[in-house]
Structures are given as structure tokens and as C-alpha cells.
């Protein structure tokens, strides 16, 4: 690998904190991929992952997924992969991406990841800079956009096509996973590769907008820190529905997914184009999001509001405005704003809160639930916003709808 900037694992939270129930096994892991055998026995029949919009719309229980990961890992070994080897993976969210990711980790191998919309020159650079010995592409179209195909065919141990198409010298997915003998496919040789917590798990590359992409290795310790410490503030039950719309190769989405999987949640993959449909169909309890997504939902609601009859528009806007002033006044009285106020200044605000409360209460009973049902599928309790703060007007709107967004920056 070329010169890489290592990001040290953060220190764990104080042991005085009570660890989330039924999750003590996480503390004793050295590798992310070790969670699957634990989850296989803890919640094996629970749906682990479902691809709503992918080519094959595959879904797997935790037991099925654990077995697939073991099989994929054995197949990689059969193709000559060993601990410390790097494989470039160019693909978007799918159960196959997840199986490849965890199968590589099972061997102690490393993946250099990127999305399918990256420029070809950027993808060429990542494959070379990471010293990859193998390549995995989502489809033949991704393979065709690369510039040095002939050189890659000679140098790489394998080039795998996740979408299973037979094309040139690419190895189809079905051929790849059937390359290992059945009796060995369920043989979990985890300890043979001497997993260590400081092993590099993945290399994430920047977009390259200010020059060549920069590779940042993350270790298993980095990811395990996230899994362990997020459990102190959230502990969803097995089977809790999670809708995943962000790219899985992004560090924030990836860390969130590992955490949700460690809880036994059921994750559904979608894409932004179908988010509105899938959020009402799946009715997720948890979502990992970014500000732009909430802005789009917010703007979509107010665009839809414009199409309503004039009287209905005015009524809804009045009720939202009333709740807006009520919530803002209440925050200031409680000194939750940055600029705190004196007791004397709180007196007129208290009058505003008292006078606006009845209509606000009616809104929370009759208006807000209907709006939230249309926007978020009625069950969303933990919308996690990462990567930056919400614009103030968007944050205020969701707060008025009694939808708190947990922020992780």
C-alpha cells in the first residue's frame, strides 16, 4: 500500500457505565466478522438483511448470512487470498457487498472500497495505490469503465462480478461461491489467521476533489469502538427494522450498519429514488441519515402542501407556526438556546407558552401523527443524523413534529 494516514482507535468509555443488556459478547471480540457466529445462535431465524431495490432483491436471516460469509471466506482462500492482502471493491449496498466485506475480514484481508459513480481515473488510482491483489465490481459496466483492464487481468488473482453476469474473464458470483467444496464451506477457520484487534479492516478513500484520493486505513479496533460505545446510548431489540439509504462504503453508514447488525436488527437496503415509498412500506424504527436527506423530505412535504386546498394549507401552516413559537419559547425559558436569558425576560415568554399550549396539544394529537406517517412511516423513533448539523429551519420543523434527531458528527 502507498502512504496512508492511520486513525488511532479511540479509548473506550468508562467501565462505570452499564453496558447494554445481552451485548457483553461484543467486548471480547478482536474482529468485526466474529459477531456473525454469535448472532447465528442468538437470533438465527431473524431477518438480517433485505435488498429492496437491487437486481436480485435478496434477503438473508442471521443464520443464512453467517453461513454465506463463511462460504465466501473459504472461496477467497481457495483463490489464494491471505491475511494482509488488499482487494478493491467497487459497488453499492447489497447483501453480496456485505458478504464480501465480512468474508475478507474473516481471512484478515483488507478491502479498499468505493462507489460505482466515481470517475474511472479515481478507481484506477485506488486499485494501484492500495496494491490490491483482487478486484470486485458490481457489474460489467463498472469493469468496462476502467482504463487499464488488460494490465489488471494479468496482475490480479481474481476479478469478480457481483451481479453474476458472464462477461469476458470476470468470475461470476455463482462461480465464485461454488468454488469451494461443500464440506469445507461451513468450516469456520477464524483462529487459523490469528485475528488481532489492530489489524487493518478497510481502506477508505477521499473523493480526490483537492488532488489524488487519500487512503485512510481503519482497524477492527476503530469499528469495534463504535459498536461498543453506541450501545451505551441505544439498544434496539433483535428484529428492529432499519432502513439504509446511505452508501455502505462511507465510514458513517458502515459503522452504523455494523452496530445495527450487532443488535440483531433487520436492515433493508434502498436508494434515494425510492426512499419515500420504502419508508412508508418498511416503517423503520431506526435510520442513519445525513442532513441533505432530511432537507429533501422537508422540502417535499412543503411542496405537497402547496397542492392542497387553500383553506387546508392555511390551517396547517397556522398550526405549524403556533407550535413553532410554542417550542421556541419553551426552549428559551429552559435556557436551552446558546444565548440564555434572564428570569425577567422569561415572563412574557411564559405567557406565550400558556396561550399557545392548547392548540399545540391538539396539533400533536391530530396533525403531527398524520404528517409523520407520511414522512417517516409512523414508527420512526431513532432518526440518527450524522456528518453535520441540520439547517436550523429543518431542525425546528422536525422538532415541532415531535421527531427528535440524534446527531452524530
What is the meaning of each model-derived region?
Residues 1, 106-179:
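Structural core segment of the AMP-binding/adenylate-forming
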Residues 8-18, 35-60:
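AMP-dependent adenylate-forming
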Residues 48-102, 119-124, 181, 220:
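Conserved AMP-binding/adenylate-forming core of the ANL superfamily
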Residues 59-63, 201-227:
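Conserved AMP-binding A3 loop
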Residues 116-148, 226-243, 273-286, 374-376:
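Conserved ATP-dependent adenylate/AMP-binding module captured primarily in the ANL superfamily
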Residues 161, 181-205, 212, 235-241:
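Conserved pre-ATP/AMP-binding loop-to-beta segment of ANL
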Residues 224-241, 248-344, 349-369, 379:
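Conserved AMP-binding/adenylation subdomain of ANL enzymes
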Residues 400-409:
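Single conserved hydrophobic/aromatic residue that forms the stacking wall/gate
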